[in-house]
């Protein structure tokens, strides 16, 4: 009888201890171990326990999407330099998935980080501009294409002859987004002036996830070969922002995705709502709606400052028009002789920032895959304003309209799509 009682007590004790262990962090760490997964992967863990099991280095689970999320607390909210390190840090912190859309790659550190992430079980999807894969990809693009299981690469081409996939987006564990002007290249890293913003608010992240999925289903597998030339409007309308920043009687969308969102017209509308100031910088400039809005703002007494890359501006009829209308206009290059002023952002009334991959061109609005994100986060807006102030203090003003000497040498068609199809300086990265 005593033996039976001892047995019952022993069983009850084991059950209590097991219950404690199953609800402890030690159990989550144990079940997260790769060896546990390999040898005991067929064990059915109850949903209430399974949902709490994070992946390696994970700190929380997103219940809405039921996936593990890495610790991104050390990833800065924005940056203007060492942008390759920011992307690598975000990749290294990822534990479940990484989705990327990129225009150009020739540096190895980000591909290295993506391959290492794949090797630890992270699912990688990459969309690359069609014309950077065909007819011959760069070595680093080829590495990703040939990386094997766990990294899937697709290509995407804009419409007409001029459209490109110009986004520079990464999405990590469906939890944070990086975007901005930064391509994964030597020039962008060491010679250009660039920016990157990091989005952690769910409203932004969800929008970018939808945009990526929208692009992914339209992108071509490598086995499908290069894309043919496609007509304007072929892709339809991308996901639209359903949340807004209300300011000056206007609903500023949280984001704008191209092609198909009339982005240049909506940016012009935003400029029309400015009451005190418009500070704008772009790499290339051919959008008449934006140029007209800038001139209207200046003529109604708004404090306008416009900045463009010097080589691109000299061949821009819209830049020349601003100058001739008296709009305060400056130009500058990059960090060195090979570099560019590659930023593309606008600050309205020192309150609203719009930044992303979108150059102020009709092509970017109509034919290319682009993104613009808007925020009224005062810390971020002020950081960009401080950076713009520094840029503007370092830039110079044209001495006469004659300095826009590249304009007269361009065909009208090239003027419309300036910067997206013509390389005026073989040493300078275009777009």
How should these model regions be labeled?
Residues 12, 418, 428-431:
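N- and C-terminal low-complexity/disordered segments
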Residues 106, 110, 286, 290-293:
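Secreted/periplasmic proteins that engage bacterial cell-wall peptidoglycan
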Residues 102-103, 282-283:
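Glycine- and other small-residue-rich loops at beta-strand/loop junctions that grip anionic moieties
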Residues 219-225, 394-413:
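Charged phosphate-binding loop/patch that engages nucleotide di/tri-phosphates or the phosphate backbone
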Residues 2-25:
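Classical Sec-dependent N-terminal signal peptides that target proteins to the secretory pathway
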